[in-house]
Swiss-Prot record:
Highest taxon in the source lineage: Bacteria
Encoding gene (name): thf1
Keywords carried by this UniProt record: Coiled coil
Gene Ontology annotations for the cellular component aspect, listed alphabetically: plasma membrane-derived thylakoid photosystem II
Protein name (record): Protein Thf1
Function as written in the Swiss-Prot or TrEMBL entry: May be involved in photosynthetic membrane biogenesis.
Family, similarity comment: Belongs to the THF1 family.
Organism this protein belongs to: Prochlorococcus marinus subsp. pastoris (strain CCMP1986 / NIES-2087 / MED4)
């Protein structure tokens, strides 16, 4: 049985394993993921499904794009997992294997495969919902389909998996918004750096 750690315990463990300063742009993302993993560690019904593993690895990858130094990312991910009793190696392996299963497939093929997991007794979480969404979004024909039809397909799959579409829709919306805000913040930082260089040359 996993040890139930408080958020303070998890933060202490995290900083012991990751003794580096986290750039301000990424600090909120890291804090939110740490708290979320800690809370999931407390849920007795929680099951670490392969779709959850995809959600964790892929959202981490997307939300930490542009992180410097890049070589810290591996330790950062491992520290986040270890600090709440999750096993980073197993999570990465499960994610890689699962992504291979759904690779180069159409939306229809992915939909059939995902719906086969309807008896898996999935534990609803933001990370799981995003794992499902990111697999669907990787479909070869996803970009060719209009938004209303995309939403209907996502809704059908989520409902078939006995999960809440309203919650999934909210999680997906917040995730997309976070990605957009990160991109905008990075652009502003880049512009500020260019401006600063020009000022110094004067």
């Amino acid at each position: 049985m996993k040890e139930k750690l408080t958020v303070s315990d998890s933060k202490k463990l995290f900083h012991e394993q990751f003794p580096y300063v986290i750039p301000g742009l990424y600090k909120r993302i890291v804090d939110e993921m740490l708290v979320e993993l800690n809370l999931l560690n407390h849920q007795n019904e929680f099951i670490q499904d392969d779709l959850f593993c995809v959600g964790l690895t892929e959202t981490f990858k997307e939300l930490t794009k542009g992180y410097k130094p890049e070589e810290h990312l591996r330790v950062l991910f491992e520290s986040l997992c270890n600090s709440s009793n999750f096993e980073p190696k197993k999570i990465k392996e499960a994610s890689k294997k699962t992504l291979e299963v759904y690779k180069d497939k159409s939306l229809k093929e992915i939909s059939i495969l995902l719906k086969q997991k309807s008896d898996s007794n999935l534990y609803s979480s933001r990370i799981l919902n995003l794992g499902i969404y990111l697999i669907i979004a990787n479909a070869t024909d996803f970009k060719d389909i209009k938004d209303p039809e995309k939403n209907k397909i996502i809704s059908d799959i989520i409902n078939k998996l006995n999960l809440s579409f309203n919650k999934a829709e909210k999680d997906i919306g917040i995730y997309k918004s976070s990605i957009l805000k990160m991109e905008q913040a990075k652009e502003l930082l880049q512009e500020a750096k260019i401006k600063d260089k020009k000022e110094k040359k004067k």
